[in-house]
Amino acid sequence: MRLGGLSKKLMAVALSSVMVVSGFAGLAPAVSVSAADDTAKLRMIFTSDLHGQLTTEDYETGKVYTTGGLSRTATLTKKAKAEVNAKNSLLFDLGDVLFDYTTDYIYDVNSSAQQPMYTAMAKMGYDAITLGNHEFDYTLDYIQKQLSSTGMSGKVVLSNVTNVNTGAHIWAENKIITKNLVTESGKTISVKVGLIGETVPTLAKKRTNYTGVLNGEDIVKNVKKEVPILQKKGADIIVVLAHSGIGEQKPAELDANTGYALTKISGVDAVLCGHLHKDFPDANGTKYDDYPGVNKTTGIVNGKPLVQIENRGASIGMVDLNIGTKNNKPTITGKSTQIRKVNASTEVDPTINAAFGNWTKTFMADSSQILSEVAADTQLQNYFGTMEDNDAIQLLNNIKISY
């Protein structure tokens, strides 16, 4: 009798336990993600060729600028970052931050003043930048001081520019950034992102001549040299930050535009481009669409993401890499590219827009100053300009000589 009663009690407890477990299972069904499918998205966002266009004003024309500007670009970069896990993004710039009316004015009027472009960029949290050819228009000493005073010097990666006499790099030859990416299931994948920074090897020489001072190495040759160096350092992924356009299929020695050729280099996983002030891929078509290995829709070229963007903050470029693991090592399982454009409805970041500070009044006054007036029905011509000087041509010549 006692054993029978005990058996009934045990059976009742077992049944109630099954009901409880089943009830909880119904409320929160378990979701299983296999290790092979559990990936993390690494999003790389970049700007390029900002050329001093910081605010919503075009001080060269005195008009409102609605299709670009870092103050609107900053909004796009924030949104792009917010779409992925906070640990899963990187922000880069490809150079030519300077070289426009505003940056030239500041340099000429007060060369010790901080360039607001770098002040603004320091607030945006760039992970790495490279330099464009036009940075070198402002002399090496000037650009070094600007980057140092704004805390941006440590962000610079410039692989193909060295000191002529010592062979030493002026800034970091390359860089590895370790990212602890968060996967879809909440786990972590540690990936070492290797960065190579390239600029136009002939530099720019408006105010100084770098002959005997700096040496610019051919971009393609330099990238081929840097890849094994980064691999030896343990880089899992290698990205080229190229102040260089896509260019020809077989660029000439010291060519400024080499992006397509860079996609053919073994070990390179993605190429980010600028310099030419044009988007690729572009729905309207580009001259590169018929190159071998080019997917004009996805921006995947020779199996690798290749993105080139416009100037003055008109667009940002993005490369998304899906990162998984194979044999306990990070591996790329998917890739995509994207370009996002600024327009009049893009929200303005007030902090970035205010970075010009007191310079704003100076620029507004200068751009609105009337130098001369011409009657509406006046006709200007220089039909005989090839035979003799005239006032119209001489004015232009004087401007060029002064510049």
Segments predicted by a language model, with ranges:
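Bacterial Sec-dependent N-terminal signal peptides
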Residues: M1-A14
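Hydrophobic core
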Residues: L15-G23
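Glycine-centered structural positions embedded in regular secondary structure
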Residues: S7, G194-G197, A283, G317, ...
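Non-catalytic terminal accessory segments
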Residues: G5, A30, A36-L42, Y65-G68, ...
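Acidic, metal/ion-coordinating pockets
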Residues: A36-K341
